[in-house]
Amino acid sequence: AMDPQQRLLLTYAWKAIEDAGYASKSLSGTKTGVFIGTGNTGYGSLLANADAEIEGSSAANTSPSVGPNRVSYTLNLHGPSEPIDTACSSSLVAIHHAVSSIEEGTCDMALAGGINTIVLPDVYISFDKAGALSKEGRCKTFSDQADGFAHGEGAGLFFLKKPKAAEADGGHIYGVIKGSAVNHGGRAASLTTPNPKQQAEVIKAAYKKAGIDPKTVSYIEAHGTGT
């Protein structure tokens, strides 16, 4: 049986392409990349616990790395096909990689985003024992009332290409990514604790690349726990 995450990924890839105004068949053979924030869902363990028969396709059907590759295979896309797992920031890092690949010419277009499904309680139990989950089941990002985060499921993909190319095609354009940046906090208070100084640095780097004065920004969204 195929991991539900892979099935959903195929569905949302198709939706993203159509929403952008393209026919999936028109992308066949093109330098279109696939960059997906993904991770282990535990579906393989679920099958093992149910004593499901191991088939020749079992390894591929339950591997997170196969998700984006299955999209590339199904749609015959010839650009890079990469799974990205950086925990809470996986989707944003996937989009960063997609943008960089388009800018350097590795691909002309890209499907980028992330997906997360939870089929076993193991992760919840671990996070709860670590004191990371909100008792109210709500994220209170940037609030002094924050008491943890809510671990959830979801999927979201963008279809990306250079602005001039998108305008020439007459596709549905939601917005323009002016710039992006990525780094790591290095040594912090603990393995999972953010490093505020390095977070500030990566934000500055993104502003600089985009050529945007921070004073002109009036709306900000933050990923995951807001870290």
Name what the model sees in each region:
Residues 1-227:
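Condensing-enzyme catalytic core of the thiolase-fold
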